[in-house]
Amino acid sequence: MARVKRGVIARARHKKILKQAKGYYGARSRVYRVAFQAVIKAGQYAYRDRRQRKRQFRQLWIARINAAARQNGISYSKFINGLKKASVEIDRKILADIAVFDKVAFSALVEKAKAALA
């Protein structure tokens, strides 16, 4: 029976993992066994954090809108409720952007929300 030599395949697999672990600290970028574990864990973190990123940005937008709304004398929840009643359909990402970069326009939106609540 012919002898099966698999050195090329194993080396290619190791090279692939070590390439993915490039930039990691110490043995995590040099030793295959440690690098493999680090790459697997990094993948798990990346998968989890792609979902968490969406939540975190929404939290950030809400915090910015709340701060700007309170400067205009209304709470976040009342502001959003007023916008819904005034049938203003602007998502939180754009509202946060307006709150940071265009305070005059945001104040106009607050007045519109207050009018809808009254």
Swiss-Prot record:
SUPFAM superfamilies: Ribosomal protein L20. GO terms for cellular component: ribonucleoprotein complex; ribosome. GO terms for biological process: ribosomal large subunit assembly; translation. The keyword Ribosomal protein applies. PROSITE patterns: RIBOSOMAL_L20 (PS00937). One of its GO terms (molecular function) is rRNA binding. It comes from the Bacteria. Keywords: Ribonucleoprotein, Ribosomal protein, RNA-binding, rRNA-binding. The keyword Ribosomal protein applies. Binds directly to 23S ribosomal RNA and is necessary for the in vitro assembly process of the 50S ribosomal subunit. It is not involved in the protein synthesizing functions of that subunit. Belongs to the bacterial ribosomal protein bL20 family. This is Large ribosomal subunit protein bL20. It comes from Cronobacter sakazakii (strain ATCC BAA-894) (Enterobacter sakazakii). The lineage of its organism: Bacteria, Pseudomonadati, Pseudomonadota, Gammaproteobacteria, Enterobacterales.
